[in-house]
UniProtKB/Swiss-Prot annotation:
Pfam families: FKS1_dom1, Glucan_synthase, Vta1. This is Callose synthase 3. Involved in callose synthesis at the forming cell plate during cytokinesis. During plant growth and development, callose is found as a transitory component of the cell plate in dividing cells, is a major component of pollen mother cell walls and pollen tubes, and is found as a structural component of plasmodesmatal canals. Residues 510-521, 580-604, 682-717, 1539-1566, 1619-1661, 1710-1761, 1814-1833, 1878-1899 are extracellular. The chain crosses the membrane at residues 489-509, 522-542, 559-579, 605-625, 661-681, 718-738, 1518-1538, 1567-1587, 1598-1618, 1662-1682, 1689-1709, 1762-1782, 1793-1813, 1834-1854, 1857-1877, 1900-1920. One of its GO terms (biological process) is regulation of cell shape. The keyword Transferase applies.
Length: 1955
């Protein structure tokens, strides 16, 4: 067992593994692990080293010989040590052998090594193999497998030793070895099903459904085996397919198990009670087949080909044929590697291979050869991988290389989608079968450097003209995609805007539209529509041009016709419009004058409009009749196709996505209401009030300009009009997002309330409804035997009353089940340390139902303190029975407590008392009392004031019973006598009957004189009178005594049990969820099976002790932090492991391990995730037990079964084994640890931690990509090649810990890949390589930062039933959405904002998206996929580099486009971690914004935008990319407004028009900007948040939290994140450069350095903030219009707020951001950074230069369009200079253009001077120091002189100097931006150095501007205090000493370190 023990020194310093090998460190981790640290080219010797480690303890010499043999074999495998790491490995091994040779020789028993080996082999064979075989049923298969493998290796070594010593091997040994060899073939490590003949008695193999599937697959009758085939035992169809098509052996084994489990699970659902005759049901077969081939059949139909699934007519053969077809598909899928992302490519391969299969079975003869049909690629080993998969894979790989890690333009390489969509056209059949190597699919443009391939097997590169190019769609970086994808929405908004402006212009009342003229004018919207149609058609052609090579003729024709028809309408409509007027307006008059103006025909225009709209009529009809639309879209009739061809191009996906009529009605109503509100608001508040001021401004004349006006005679003041209207129009396009937030909050809230969310919010509410909880448990979590559909809804849940006290027979079962489930949940709380031992006792229900108590036993926390209160009431009751009874019965729980205590009192007394006389006395006393209870005069008859005294005695008795010690016997006897006395004397008041009975029992003293001692008889005193101490003590008895003790002694109320907030939240959510609508639970055996898949790269697995204890720069270690944040959980942990302090923990290895686990369960670690997911299995085992247990077992309880199974009956027939087998059938958990192989070989501690997890959870499976060096197969070449495998490993369950077994992983499957799996984004491919090892019908994708809870796992089988119901009446769900609970919001206010924002999105947001809007996609992680649906449609994520950056949402897009259906369920939740520091949050937001930028360009969004109906398209827009685009518009609005104001102020127009209302008091503009501010401060986030908190925790809480958030500066956070989103979204659309940003998963309470913040936010926030500040300052100086207006003040404040936030939020939210010492350190650090010289290899963190070059890298890949846009945007910085030079005192008199020219001269002069200085510095500063100083002095003097002259002669003022700075600074910045954009040109001109110097100057100024205010504030200590309070208010309110965490505890540490 040494493999699982790791000492404290075994921390992160693991990579020094080599040293561990060389030095002998017996029993250390390194020792047993050295068999794992083997170079990849020597993989074959690992088993030998494993055996050596295993036998070392029993025979060191044999271990030595094994190692020696391993060394020899290593030398044979790689004689020249050419493999990586081989030489070092051999050296280390040799050194070890030299060291061990002599000591082991001394210890040798036999004369020679050969004899020693033989004797050991025989000993091993007898001790292990024979002994295990004789153990019959109890043989542990894992141990047998291992024993056979070990014996095999030992024999191999033995043979080698005998050969060296030329000794014959004994006959006996050879015979034994023959048996071993035969068995080793059979006993291979298996995954779930052991399919070898000897395992037929394993529990899982005895299930009839499994047997049926196995038998069905073994039906190989009539299959034509190839010649020379050796028949094996138990051959099945998959073996035949392997022989014929050349699949890999492990792939066949993997898919065999997959298919058997799939069929068995579906079979058992068809027949809930299967007959014992195992025969596979045809219906089950058909169901699986239908799901598996639905996509394939659809593909065949789409391409007009007959499918290859030909079924025979004979019934017997039918089943065989179906199974063959399914097995073939799964085998292709299982080996397809990256081709799995291309579902239609797999269809193509399958189509041909299935046809070959049919040909072989039908005995067809090939027309070419005249022989029977054979597969085109033959059946030799690995033929399928080499000849089918690899060629296609190589194309994917080459294309991925051409993407240059995503830096190339999307249009220059084909991504997975392009390659897959090649198979959407009939042309794909030109590929042929066998595939032609010269087909266009395999062609690549212009030579690709073939570095990675070996010369021979690379394809000849074909010239570019054959390259297929992009298919169907080109992702081009452009904002136009937003308009193109959602053109209907933009058209609608623009037309509405036009109509509203016309109406407002002509009268203003909406009713005026009915006036003839206005109506005619409004009709002009159709002309606009035609123009937009033309724009759309042209845009389509331009953006799709790069895909023209792959387009068919009719698609090209459609594009061209669309342009021509749109152009025609653009001519026809205006002309007919002009002729509809008698007296036409200006624009129409012009047209009329061209064509002759005589005619007048109004009807012509109407006819034209109707014709123009006719195609839209079709769309309208299709919208109203969704079924018709579905039929038309799927139809293959020519006429229909022609009709549809015009309205939308024919595509394989995106057809038939309609919803049911009711769903359609719901989301249509939502949007109709929303749009109506929005338009009314826009019209009445923004547009109409602005019309009159606009008309006035257009009439006004301005002659007095304050700058050089280029167009002084321009009419209508058009510039002013644009400046006024632009912000309003932008807000008009954006404010739908605000309305969406409002409406979604309302509807989401109402919907949530109807779903019964938040009915149980607090523990008080739970207490009040606890009586109905057992009913709910049994109703929801226990399958209903009758299998009927239960009624749903509120009445159903409430009608289930479970409050009777008596327990009828079937209620007894219900109570037992409730107890099992409830106690499991409570125990899991205890294991997680959420509650203490006492709290657990108070919360548990008795496991062992006490049958003598005829009532329900509630958990003690409900009954606590009831008995002492009842006693007081009885004591003071004064003989009034009825009154007391009424008072007790008014409290149900008190009634239960009193009855239970009395009953238990009776039972315990009767159980303990054994003597006959004593029994008699007691029976009579109880009979008397019971009689009085029945007649109801107990209190009248008896004296109750003595009751407390009896109570005290009884409590003492219970205490003695709890301790159960022999020495207390005498005390117990006296106690009984005391109790008897109290009862008879004080309570019954000398009742004559009783007294006489007691006296007679004592054997009184009637004849005088003394009786001898031995004859004296005292009650209870004789030896057999009472049973004490109790022997044997059962668990049930212990539990009973403990419970009664709690009931009697708990004085205080248990209102605050459990006290832990997390435990409370979980209990209340779980209880509440049981009252919500959820499907009925099926039996575990009949439920849908499912898998969980977690991709893992290199994150934390388990914190090492060193990680936990190493303090950060503030002296805070993770452990200290966790102890302070979770103080109660830490104390509970110490209590659980029975330690008093941290020091005690470190004394034992086992406790140390516990400590590491405790900390890891509170971080975002893989350990936490695995524990959470393994609750599913625990839950299934428990539920299987409840399903299968007989009445007796059920009453004994699950705990008893578990205990029994551990003690004795490990038999495969035991109930426990059956429960485990069912759990195995239904649940698999695969963690895809991409790097596990590499970690293992390098001795990385993470590999050991993962191994620990597998040991802890034997059913956990780990998949990884193994990179192995193998010698090249081709003999002509030397050297090694890298080969990649997909590997699945497990650690076998080891039952007997005493054996030599070490816990090492076993390889189950090892499937070779065509090459490296990671070609795209990484995570999707990591999921994809492991998905073949998943099982079942559901697949839950879980990220490694998630968590799960025991109580939620119990609801999983209910959730999976959702797959069987049609949610919208049209289709079954393909993805079930789950809600998440964000568990990282506990400490800082930022984490709290983030978790609130995230929580509201995953609850109220997604609830609304799923229903009514029907546009929920897949947003990451806990969603459950319909596995068969997705594995045949491209998997659970998309993987193309960059475009699929947020890979998960594309799974949702894909699902929806392929007619899936995504739902959302709120009765079950999964935990999730989020980032907690501002920098991590910003990185996360940047990643999401980048992802949205890429989505905007993607084909999926384009298709959804075009294929959804109008309203669903609106939902799709506003919930995906629209949210980000609206954010962008929000920021743009501010810019446009400020630049508009700048134009008005500097040109003098504002002054000239200052009397105009439009300038002075512009309400619409104020409202528009107010709505912008709403978005800015996070209104869109806060509303749903408020509603959700209100729903789930009460509206008072919501309101107080809202106020708190404002106080903690939430608006600052939201305004700041607005900037992040805008910057990264905009930059991605323009330039690309989106990359996966790894965000933190750690604990963030550390201070971020100023330089870090500067690097992160400089471009996204600081530059923009300073630009806006500049605009505001200029406006403050020169603007005059309406300073006094309040609304204006508020708007200005809002803008200044944005500026302040963007500049200072990072410092505000930075822990210790205002601490003086930190500020000083930051300044030094920043100075060092800004002045460091960059260069190759200098990272951005070290030098400003490197960072600056990196920061503009995106411009290099941006393409011409991006550069042009960048330059145009930079031109805005020249406006300042142009405007401001005319506002100087010197230039007041002249408005000549020369002034502007002179200002440029000044700029160039300044630049020249700067250049001179820098050249001087380079040339002179070293040698001619004096010269250089003179030059500098001269320049300075000249500068001063010029300033003085200007002040004296030209009357220059201080303001002028400031204005000059304001004018010239932006110009310089603009020039810098342009220089950066044109870097290659500037470089060639030799100016790049100067540009860099200028840029550094700007950065220093910016840094100073930011740093100064922060440093100033840091002078005042109270600022730092305030900041800490604001940041960590959550912690303060929980009483945590955050100051200790922040300030660290350095003194404390240092003193400890000294010790």
């Amino acid at each position: 067992m040494s493999a699982t023990r790791g000492g404290p020194d075994q921390g992160p310093s693991q990579p020094q593994q080599r040293r561990i090998i060389r030095t002998q460190t017996a029993g250390n981790l390194g020792e047993s692990f050295d068999s794992e640290v083997v170079p990849s080219s020597l993989v074959e010797i690992a088993p030998i080293l494993r055996v050596a480690n295993e036998v070392e303890s029993s025979n060191p010499r044999v271990a030595y010989l094994c190692r020696f043999y391993a060394f020899e074999k290593a030398h044979r495998l790689d004689p020249t040590s050419s493999g990586r790491g081989v030489r070092q490995f051999k050296t280390a091994l040799l050194q070890r052998l030299e060291r061990e040779h002599d000591p082991t020789l001394m210890g040798r028993v036999k004369k020679s090594d050969a004899r020693e080996m033989q004797s050991f082999y025989q000993h091993y064979y007898k001790k292990y193999i024979q002994a295990l075989h004789n153990a019959a049923d109890k043989a542990d298969r894992a141990q047998l497998t291992k024993a056979y493998q070990t014996a095999n290796v030992l024999f191999e070594v033995l043979k080698a030793v005998n050969l060296t010593q030329s000794i014959e091997v004994d006959r006996e040994i050879l015979e034994a070895q023959d048996k071993v060899a035969e068995k080793t073939q059979l006993y291979v490590p298996y995954n779930i099903l052991p399919l070898d003949p000897d395992s037929a008695n394993q529990a899982i193999m005895r299930y009839p459904e499994i047997q049926a599937a196995v038998l069905a697959l073994r039906n190989t009758r009539g299959l034509p085996w190839p010649e020379g085939h050796k028949k094996k035992k138990d051959e099945d169809m998959l073996d035949w397919l392997q022989e014929m098509f050349g699949f890999q052996k492990d792939n066949v084994a993997n898919q065999r198990e997959h298919l058997i489990l799939l069929l068995a699970n579906v079979h058992i659902r068809q027949f809930p009670k299967p007959d014992q005759q195992p025969k596979l049901d045809d219906q089950a077969l058909t169901e699986v087949m239908k799901k598996l081939f639905k996509n394939y059949k659809k593909w065949c139909k789409y391409l007009g080909r007959k499918s290859s699934l030909w079924l025979p007519t004979i019934q017997q053969e039918m089943q065989q044929r179906k199974l063959l077809y399914m097995a073939l598909y799964l085998l292709i899928w299982g080996e397809a590697a990256n081709l799995r992302f291309m579902p239609e490519c797999l269809c193509y391969i399958y189509h041909h291979m299935a046809f070959e299969l049919y040909g072989m079975l039908a005995g067809n003869v090939s027309p070419m050869t005249g022989e029977n049909v054979k597969p085109a690629y033959g059946g030799e080993e690995d033929a399928f991988l080499r000849k089918v998969v690899t060629p296609i894979y190589e194309v994917i790989q080459m294309e991925a290389q051409r993407s240059k890690k995503g830096k190339s333009k999307h249009s220059q390489w084909r991504n997975y989608d392009d390659l897959n969509e090649y198979f959407w056209s009939v042309d794909c059949f030109r590929l042929g079968w066998p595939m032609r190597a010269d087909a266009d699919f395999f062609c690549l443009p212009v030579a690709v450097p073939n570095t990675e391939k070996d010369g021979d097997n690379s394809k000849p590169i074909v010239a570019r003209d054959r390259w297929v190019g992009k298919v169907n769609f080109v992702e081009i970086r452009s904002f136009w995609h937003v308009f193109r994808s959602f053109d209907r929405m933009w058209s609608f908004y623009i037309l509405c805007l036009q109509a509203m402006i016309i109406m407002a212009w002509d009268g203003g009342q909406p009713s005026s539209v009915f006036g003839a003229d206005v109506f005619k004018k409004v009709l002009s919207v159709f002309i606009t529509a035609a123009i937009m149609k033309l724009g759309q058609a042209v845009l389509d052609v331009i953006l799709n041009f790069k895909a023209h090579q792959s387009m068919t003729l009719h698609v090209k024709l459609r594009y061209i016709l669309k342009v021509f028809s749109a152009a025609a309408w653009v001519i026809i409509l205006p002309v007919t419009y002009a002729y509809s007027w008698k007296d036409p307006p200006a624009f129409a008059r012009t047209i009329k004058s061209w064509f002759g103006s005589a005619m007048h025909s109004p009807s012509l225009f109407i006819i034209a409009v109707v014709s123009y709209l006719s195609p839209n009529m079709l769309a309208g009809v299709m919208f109203l009749f969704p079924l018709l639309r579905r039929f038309l879209e799927r139809s293959n009739y020519r006429i229909v196709m022609l009709m549809m061809w015009w309205s939308q191009p024919r595509l394989y996906v995106g057809r038939g996505m309609h919803e049911s009529a009711f769903s359609l009605f719901k989301y249509t109503m939502f949007w109709v209401l929303l749009i109506a509100t929005k338009l009314a608001f826009s019209y009445y508040i923004e547009i109409r009030p602005l019309v009159a001021p606009t008309q006035a401004i257009m009439k006004a004349r301005v002659t007095n300009f304050q700058w050089h006006e280029f167009f002084p005679r321009a009419k209508n003041n058009i510039g002013v009009v644009i400046a006024l209207w632009a912000p309003i129009i932008l807000v008009y396009f954006m404010d739908s997002q605000i309305w969406y937030a409002i409406f979604s909050t309302l509807f989401g809230g109402i919907y949530g309330a109807f779903r019964r969310l938040g009915e149980i919010r607090t523990l008080g509410m739970l207490r009040s409804r606890f009586e109905s909880l057992p009913g709910a448990f049994n109703d929801r979590l226990i399958p209903d035997g009758k299998n009927q559909q239960k009624k749903k809804g509120i009445r159903a849940t409430l009608s289930h009353n479970f409050t009777e006290d008596k327990v009828p027979v079937n209620k007894e079962k219900e109570a037992a089940r409730f107890a099992q489930l409830w106690n499991t949940i409570i125990s899991s709380f205890r294991e997680e340390d959420l509650i203490s031992d006492r709290e657990m006792d108070l919360l548990l229900v008795p496991y062992w139902a006490d049958r003598d108590l005829d009532l329900i036993q509630w958990p003690p926390f409900l009954l606590a303190s009831k008995i002492p209160i009842a006693l007081d009431m009885a004591k003071d009751s004064n003989g009034k029975d009825r009154e007391l009874k009424k008072r007790i019965e008014s409290d149900t729980y008190m009634k239960c407590a009193v009855r239970e205590c009395y009953a238990s009192f009776k039972n315990i007394i009767k159980f303990v008392v054994q003597g006959n006389r004593e029994k008699e006395v007691i029976e009579i006393i109880f009979a008397e009392v019971d009689k009085h209870i029945d007649t109801g005069d107990l209190i009248q008859e008896y004296k109750m004031s003595a009751l407390p005294s009896l109570y005290d005695h009884f409590v003492k008795l219970i205490k003695y019973l709890l301790d159960n010690k022999e020495e207390d016997r005498d005390h117990v006897v006296i106690l009984f006598q005391d109790m008897l006395e109290v009862v008879t004397r004080d309570i019954m008041m000398e009742d004559y009957n009783i007294s006489s009975l007691v006296d007679s029992s004592h054997g009184g003293t009637w004849h005088g004189g003394m009786i001898p001692l031995e004859q004296q008889y005292q009650l209870f005193a004789s030896s057999g009178a009472i049973r004490f101490p109790i022997e044997p003590v059962t668990e049930a008895w212990k539990e009973k005594i403990k419970r009664i003790y709690l009931l009697l002694t708990t004085k205080e109320s248990a209102m605050d049990v459990p006290s832990n907030l997390e435990a409370r939240r979980r209990i209340s959510f779980f209880s509440n969820s049981l009252f919500m609508d959820m499907p009925m639970a099926p039996k575990v055996r009949n439920m849908l099976s499912f898998s969980v898949l977690t991709p893992y790269y290199t994150e934390e697995v388990l914190f090492s002790l060193r990680d936990l204890e190493t303090p950060n720069e503030d002296g805070v270690s993770i452990l200290f932090y966790l102890q302070k944040i979770f103080p109660d959980e830490w104390n509970n942990f110490l209590e659980r492991v029975k330690c008093l302090s941290e020091e005690e923990l470190k004394e034992s290895d086992e406790l140390e391990e516990e400590l590491r686990l405790w900390a890891s369960y509170r971080g975002q670690t893989l350990t936490r995730t695995v524990r959470g997911m393994m609750y599913y299995r625990k839950a299934l085992e428990l539920q299987a037990f409840l399903d299968m247990a007989m009445h007796e077992d059920l009453m004994e309880g699950y705990k008893a079964v578990e205990l029994n199974s551990e003690n004795n009956s490990r038999g495969e027939r035991s109930l426990w084994a059956q429960c485990q087998a069912v759990a195995d059938m239904k649940f698999t958990y695969v963690v895809s640890c991409q790097q596990y192989g590499i970690h293992k070989r390098s001795g990385d501690p993470r590999a050991q931690d993962i191994l620990r997890l597998m040991t802890r959870y034997p059913s956990l499976r780990v998949a990884y990509i193994d990179e192995v060096e193998e010698p090249v197969k081709d003999k002509s070449k030397k050297g090694n090649q890298k080969v990649y495998y997909s590997v699945l490993v497990k650690v076998p369950k080891s039952t007997d810990h005493s054996t030599l077994a070490q816990n090492l992983d076993q390889v189950i499957y090892r499937i070779r890949l065509p090459g490296p799996a990671i070609l795209g984004e990484g995570k999707p491919e990591n999921q994809n390589h492991a998905i073949i090892f998943s099982r079942g019908e559901g697949l839950q994708t879980i990220d490694m930062n998630q968590d799960n809870y025991m109580e939620e796992a119990l609801k999983m089988r209910n959730l999976l039933q959702e797959f069987l119901t049609k949610h919208d009446g049209v289709r079954h769900p393909s993805i079930l959405g789950l809600r998440e609970h964000i568990f990282t919001g506990s400490v800082s206010s930022l984490a709290w904002f983030m978790s609130n924002q995230e929580t509201s999105f995953v609850t109220i947001g997604q609830r609304l998206l799923a229903n009514p809007l029907r546009v929920r996609f897949h947003y990451g992680h806990p969603d459950v996929f319909d596995r068969l649906f997705h594995l045949t449609r491209g998997g659970v994520s998309k993987a193309s580099k960059v475009i699929n950056l947020s890979e998960d949402i594309f799974a949702g897009f894909n699902s929806t486009l392929r007619e899936g259906n995504v739902t959302h369920h709120e009765y079950i939740q999964v935990g999730k971690g989020r980032d907690v520091g501002l920098n991590q949050i910003s990185m996360f937001e940047a990643k999401i914004a980048n992802g949205n930028g890429e989505q905007t360009l993607s084909r999926d969004i384009y298709r959804l935008g075009h294929r959804f109906d109008f309203f669903r398209m609106m939902s799709c827009y506003f919930t995906t990319v629209g949210f980000y685009f609206s954010t962008l518009i929000t920021v743009l609005t501010v810019y446009i407004f400020l630049y508009g104001r700048l134009y008005l102020v500097l040109s003098g127009l504002e002054q000239g028009l200052s009397t105009q209302k439009g300038i002075r008091d512009n309400t619409p503009l104020q409202i528009a900007l107010a709505s912008q501010s709403f978005v800015q401060i996070g209104f869109l986030m806060a509303l749903p948040m408020l509603m959700e908190i209100g729903l789930e925790r009460g509206f008072r809480t919501a309101l107080s939290e809202f106020v708190l958030m404002q106080l903690q500066l939430a608006p600052v956070f939201f305004t700041f994140s607005l900037g992040t989103k805008t910057h990264y979204y905009g930059r991605t659309l323009l330039h690309g450069g989106a990359k996966y940003r790894s965000t933190g998963r750690g604990f963030v309470v550390f201070h971020a350095k100023f330089a870090d913040n500067y690097r992160l936010y400089s471009r996204s926030h600081f530059v923009k903030g300073l630009e806006m500040m500049l605009l505001l300052v200029v406006y403050q100086i020169f603007g005059s219009a309406y300073r006094g207006v309040l609304a204006y003040l508020l708007i200005t404040i809002s803008m200044w707020f944005m500026v302040g936030t963007w500049l200072f939020a990072p410092f505000l939210f930075n822990p210790s951001g205002f601490e003086w010492q930190k500020i000083v350190d930051d300044w030094t650090d920043w100075n060092k950074w800004i002045n460091n010289i960059g260069g190759i290899g200098v990272p951005a963190e070290k030098s400003w230069e490197s960072w600056w070059e990196e920061e503009q890298e995106h411009l290099r890949y941006s393409g011409k369009r991006g550069i042009v846009v960048e330059i145009l945007l930079a031109l805005r910085f020249f406006i300042y200079q142009y405007g401001l030079v005319y506002h100087l005192t010197i230039t007041e008199k002249t408005k000549n253009f020369l002034v502007y020219g002179v200002s440029w001269l000044v700029i160039f002069l300044i630049l020249f001077v700067m250049k001179t200085v820098s050249v001087g510095r380079r040339r002179f500063s070293a040698s001619f120091q004096l010269m250089f100083r003179l030059i500098k002095g001269l320049i300075f003097m000249t500068f001063i002189a010029i300033i003085v002259i200007l002040i004296t002669l030209a009357h220059m003022t201080i303001q002028d100097i400031i204005v000059c700075i304001l004018a010239f600074m932006p110009t310089g910045w603009g020039m810098l931006l342009i220089a950066q954009a044109c870097k290659p040109v500037v470089h060639r001109a030799g100016f790049w150095g100067s540009v860099r110097t200028l840029a550094r100057g700007y950065e220093i100024v910016m840094g100073l501007l930011l740093f100064t205010p922060v440093a100033f504030l840091a002078w005042f200590p109270f600022v730092s205090e305030f900041q800490t309070r604001m940041l960590f208010n959550q912690a303060f309110s929980r009483g945590l000493q955050i100051s200790r965490i922040l300030g660290g505890h350095r003194k404390d540490r240092s003193s400890r370190n000294k010790e």
